[in-house]
């Protein structure tokens, strides 16, 4: 493994880990950064599956206590049964739309201009949602109804557009639908588990021929890096939301999106081949 390839794997692992669970779009950042450092082609598709799986395993580890409690109580406790049902209900819309439109979206929308526009629009919506007066009816994830779960699941489908952000769509959706900031964030993390594992399994099977033994060192660098930085990001976000709003992330999205559009408009960076991941 050449040092440059290892460096690319490290950088993309850091980007995936830091951005997957922040409301700033990991896919959008991956498209932009991968293009800037020249990491693309067939191997990149397999690599992305690996680092996304690492990120979700970091969340599973971080919430292992809650997961164990739910699994233990599922046969007999109504609260655990309702929580599990809500996750399945929220997961369902993404499954349906993902199977129907994933390839089409990847072909037509995976490019930096779409990412930039989605970042800006999402940032504006996030600012509006944060400044809007909230009527909270679900302080904790266990207070959610199946209707809350379904609405958040539908909001998650917006994240199929790169640059939107899966966590951003579900968290802001949760706030708009009456969840507290803590409940919306935690449910977003839990919903990420079946959603991302399902996506990884589907993509892994689809691109199974792209996994080659000679790429294992590259995958290992990306996996470890993504896992570590995802865990750090999740812990930091859970502490951050205790005393802060999501406005800082919204302004970052807007600034980053406008920067991408400016580099495209003034031909400072050639984005013509970007998104081929």
Swiss-Prot record:
Disulphide-bridged cysteine pairs: none
GO biological process, one term: peptidoglycan biosynthetic process
Coiled coil: none
Keywords: Antibiotic resistance, Cell inner membrane, Cell membrane, Cell shape, Cell wall biogenesis/degradation, Hydrolase, Membrane, Peptidoglycan synthesis, Transmembrane, Transmembrane helix
Biological role stated in the UniProt entry: Catalyzes the dephosphorylation of undecaprenyl diphosphate (UPP). Confers resistance to bacitracin.
Locations listed in the record: Cell inner membrane
Protein name as it appears in the record: Undecaprenyl-diphosphatase
Keyword Chaperone on entry: no
Protein origin, superkingdom: Bacteria
Regions that span the bilayer: 47-67, 85-105, 108-128, 183-203, 218-238, 249-269
Organism: Pseudomonas aeruginosa (strain LESB58)
GO MF: undecaprenyl-diphosphatase activity
Catalyzed chemical reaction(s): di-trans,octa-cis-undecaprenyl diphosphate + H2O = di-trans,octa-cis-undecaprenyl phosphate + phosphate + H(+)
